[in-house]
Amino acid sequence: MSTTNYPLLERVNDPADLRRLPRAELKALATELRAFVLESVSKTGGHLSSNLGTVELTVALHAVFDTPRDRLVWDVGHQTYPHKILTGRRDRMPSLRQLGGLSGFPQRAESEYDTFGTAHSSTSISAALGMALAAKQRGDERRCVAIIGDGAMTAGMAFEALNNAGVADANLLVILNDNDMSISPPVGALNRYLAQLMSGQFYAKARDVGKSVLKNAPPLLELAKRLEQQAKGMVVPATLFEKFGFNYIGPIDGHDLDSLIPTLENIRGLKGPQFLHVVTKKGQGYKLAEADPVAYHGPGKFDPRVGLVKPATPPKQTFTQVFGQWLCDMAEKDERLVGITPAMREGSGMVEFHQRFPERYYDVGIAEQHAVTFAAGMACEGAKPVVAIYSTFLQRAYDQLIHDVALQNLPVVFALDRAGLVGADGATHAGAYDIAFVRCIPNMSMACPADERECRQLLTTAYEQDHPVAVRYPRGAGVGVAPLPDLEGLPFGKGEVRRKGRRMAILAFGTLLYPALQAAEALDATVVNMRWAKPLDTQLLLQVAAEHDALVTVEEGCIMGGAGSAVAEALAAAGVQRPLLQLGLPDAFIEHGDPAKLLALQGLDAAGMQRSITERFGALPGEQALAAA
């Protein structure tokens, strides 16, 4: 991407270059940086609103702090495109979130300026505190800064870190990037507190009174300090963060470099834990994103002159949409149903449910642990909770899943979106481990629908059970198998034979059924749609094993401990010996890229399956070559 239109930005190859610029030019640099972010994301897709909102803050941080010696830890990290551009990766932005290209999140392996890898929320304060105390032990005076959003601040982990940091005597700066907008609208008492603090007549009046108090203060140092604290107390009544032991500064305008830079310079010289409250606006500087920051949170490619345009041909229904429609239909049928989400209303397909059944919709904020135990409590009182959560985020509530739900055998349905590889978001968001970590829990079951129709049917089956059940389904469009309008389920724990072949049987779990069927045509193999990773349809498995010379399992999840392992365990328990090939995700983190290309690289497309099977078991008589897609 050409930098011809960005003359100042072209001169900044690292933060040292930025610090050499005259302060008077930093505003112009921020303007160029914002335009560069917009142009870049419009060509590659990615996170936009959050990055447009952190431009000035990023410029100010690199202008004031001696990065990378001073540590910047970005919470979540999807707002770090300006940071990447200023830290030597400007010319690689066209590769953003593409196979072999820049990650959309901070990665330690990508740059020394990415001091801590992030993508899940609310980890920054803990990490920055650890860095600060490690530096203190070595006698190093470096500064450590955590930048965290108001949505991420609602998570319990953030408060655990604040509680520790307030008494740790570390040179830690926590910057609250208060933009009143996580992916879904932020909820909870903390966000209400921040909103009240920043809105209405009280803040304006208190600010004016504070200025008046300071203006009229006698020129006595101690009295002036006392009055300053009183004035600050009037602006920020009983400041929550000061109760944690932090020196609270703010709120200040996060888009005003004339405020940001001197404030950060003053803070840099202070000892102990500091808390800076910065107010920003998501989508700042691009009117379309300012008006609809959710739509521009993570857009695909678009023309910035006209904005997002709906495709002329409606795309295939997504699994997320299938879930959202099922949730509304089941809620109409059963008034006991309640829907729970940890701050992912839009991403989990719950917008319509929220609109139609607001009294039965619960957004608990970025609080996965609380969401799961909250669901358990509701189930104890006769409600029928459905927890809509990304597979990767359920990892954060594993103890609650075991201790609070499964141990008590409570009928909670977990709708696990983003199961398997997720493409551009990469390893941090991959739902690679859910089969393995769910199936080992007593009382838990795990369904793996192969398409949109089965997704709706298996959600119904899960809902009808009197114990906890997880239903996993991938991100994005289905295969085009339209769901049936009724709410009929499928038999619990039962699979089906989809294709009869000879010698060899492929046992497919989830959406890899369809490439398995393609591969089977060339191999003349039997294909079984297993549907359930737990309970395994052992009767069908043993029948298929008796009729075939070799077995293959395919799953879009980790091989270790996954569905293939369940098949191996069942065969061993029955004393059945059959050659078994397990295909799935390896013991490695799969980085970002196009989902189809990533599956092909792992040998999980039709051609890859045929290749792996042939290499293991040899060519079959009359086998046809399967052309790679």
Swiss-Prot record:
Keyword annotations: Isoprene biosynthesis, Magnesium, Metal-binding, Thiamine biosynthesis, Thiamine pyrophosphate, Transferase
Entries under Pfam families matching the protein: DXP_synthase_N, Transket_pyr, Transketolase_C
Reactions performed catalytically: D-glyceraldehyde 3-phosphate + pyruvate + H(+) = 1-deoxy-D-xylulose 5-phosphate + CO2
EC number: 2.2.1.7
Co-factor binding comment: Binds 1 Mg(2+) ion per subunit.
Segments passing through the bilayer: none
Chain residues that bind thiamine diphosphate: H78, A119, H120, S121, G151, A152, N179, Y286, E368
Cellular component, GO annotation: cytosol
Source organism, top-level taxon: Bacteria
CC cofactor: Mg(2+); thiamine diphosphate
Top EC class, one word: transferase
Alphabetized GO MF terms: 1-deoxy-D-xylulose-5-phosphate synthase activity; magnesium ion binding; thiamine pyrophosphate binding
Associated pathway: Metabolic intermediate biosynthesis; 1-deoxy-D-xylulose 5-phosphate biosynthesis; 1-deoxy-D-xylulose 5-phosphate from D-glyceraldehyde 3-phosphate and pyruvate: step 1/1
InterPro entries on file: Dxylulose-5-P_synthase, THDP-binding, Transketo_C/PFOR_II, Transketolase-like_Pyr-bd, Transketolase_BS, Transketolase_C, Transketolase_CS
UniProt-listed GO biological process terms: 1-deoxy-D-xylulose 5-phosphate biosynthetic process; isopentenyl diphosphate biosynthetic process, methylerythritol 4-phosphate pathway; terpenoid biosynthetic process; thiamine biosynthetic process
HAMAP family named among the record's database cross-references: DXP_synth (MF_00315)
NCBIfam families reported for this sequence: dxs, PRK05444.2-2
Recorded family membership: Belongs to the transketolase family. DXPS subfamily.
PANTHER family documented for this protein: 1-D-DEOXYXYLULOSE 5-PHOSPHATE SYNTHASE-RELATED, 1-DEOXY-D-XYLULOSE-5-PHOSPHATE SYNTHASE, CHLOROPLASTIC
Self-association and partners: Homodimer.
Function: Catalyzes the acyloin condensation reaction between C atoms 2 and 3 of pyruvate and glyceraldehyde 3-phosphate to yield 1-deoxy-D-xylulose-5-phosphate (DXP).
Name of the protein described by the UniProt record: 1-deoxy-D-xylulose-5-phosphate synthase
Gene: dxs
